[in-house]
Amino acid sequence: MEKIIVRGGRQLSGSVKVEGAKNAVLPVIAASILASRGTSKIYDVPKLADVYTMKEVLRNLNINVEYENGEFVVNATNPLKTEAPFEYVRKMRASFLVMGPLLARVGHARIALPGGCAIGSRPIDQHLKGFEAMGATVEIGNGFIEAKVEGRLQGTKIYLDFPSVGATENIMMAAAMAEGTTILENAAEEPEIVCLANYLNAMGAKVRGAGTGVIRIEGVDELVGAEHTVISDRIEAGTFMVAAAITGGDVFIEGAVAEHLRPLIAKMHEMGVKTIEEDNGIRVIGPDELKPVDIKTMPHPGFPTDMQSQMMALLLRANGTSVITETVFENRFMHVEEFRRMNGNIKIEGRSAIISGPCQLQGAEVTATDLRAGAALVLAGLVADGHTRVVELKHVDRGYVDLAGKLARLGADIERVVETEHELENLDAPAPLKLNTNLV
């Protein structure tokens, strides 16, 4: 079984470079379907399992795709197929983002019901509501969603019941080639939405207001291939910020954009963590003692749900009681049981987790229940006594490029291995945690 093994007790230091954003690159790749002429080149594409899945989805649609050295090249000028099969879509929820572009381009899409991390129902009704408002007919059956439109989609006004990132992206892409103007209200405001809008506009679309609650999309007749550089991954950056803070370390996160991380930075300051914003990244210096804080996840610009589990790991080390309230997903506390296996003192009350710290974490074998939970368990292992062994790395690989290797280069005692039962019997005793005494 492949595992990440962490032996706690080392203070992190040095520099780490953030990859292109997973949550930005997947919709950008989907949007490349809209280009009926020319070739699209997408830069800073991270080497992630989800990227390879999206590559196979596009190839299945008869699209030419090349991916090498962080550059994703797409030529979608061939006659398109319109079905994304379960084989690929089951692996990754973002595969559903091809529906909007296919509807806009050829008027038909048949997509298997999506998969991905099991962190809540995450319904796709808001996507379908938007397509139907633009004139599509939608049918669901036999594990597939099929949408059709006669002629072109029609621009209209759409109000989202919740500022869903995926629905905002799918509707934006569909509306880019609709007849007339679409006004999308209560839209998601994440930086990844702005990244997608910039790419669509480079292709010839007319998208205004991305990054605000109201987006206006004036439909055009044709989109062409374009070049685009993906924004840096704010969640990966945040994960390494927590790694520095939890170990009392001093780490520079190259490529981190402070404007994308304001809620996290604010909470870290409350906890006593020092951050220094520089032109090309953020330096994070962990304190000798962490203070407790309360956190409530919210759609952007609120605290990101994708940083909830990592912050829970950090709060386990804080001196006092903290409360995390999860408002975005109803089932995103599955990692709590894994933290408890490591001696984490956490109580669940409805949508809130009450963390009583500081906890002297103990190494254990734990399971990555989803993508971000896997990273959080690795973070906890950095300060746990003994060895922490994290399994189900398929989840971690969906969102992190060489997480263990990057942490090792910062000084962590960590490795990724195929472990046998015999090796489990020969693990050494833990090293003591060294505290940072050189704060600036």
UniProtKB/Swiss-Prot annotation:
Give the keywords, sorted.
Cell cycle, Cell division, Cell shape, Cell wall biogenesis/degradation, Cytoplasm, Peptidoglycan synthesis, Pyruvate, Transferase
Detail which positions bind UDP-N-acetyl-alpha-D-glucosamine.
R93, R122, P123, I124, D125, Q126, D306, V328
Where phosphoenolpyruvate binds, per the record, is at: K22, N23
Name of one Pfam family that matches = EPSP_synthase
Q: Record keywords: Endoplasmic reticulum included?
A: no
Protein name, as recorded: UDP-N-acetylglucosamine 1-carboxyvinyltransferase 1
- Which catalytic residues are annotated? C117 (proton donor)
Reaction catalyzed? phosphoenolpyruvate + UDP-N-acetyl-alpha-D-glucosamine = UDP-N-acetyl-3-O-(1-carboxyvinyl)-alpha-D-glucosamine + phosphate
Q: What class of enzyme is it?
A: transferase
Which pathway? Cell wall biogenesis; peptidoglycan biosynthesis
Where are residues bearing 2-(S-cysteinyl)pyruvic acid O-phosphothioketal located in the sequence?
Answer: C117
UniProt function note: Cell wall formation. Adds enolpyruvyl to UDP-N-acetylglucosamine.
Q: Where in the cell is it found?
A: Cytoplasm
CDD domains for this protein: UdpNAET
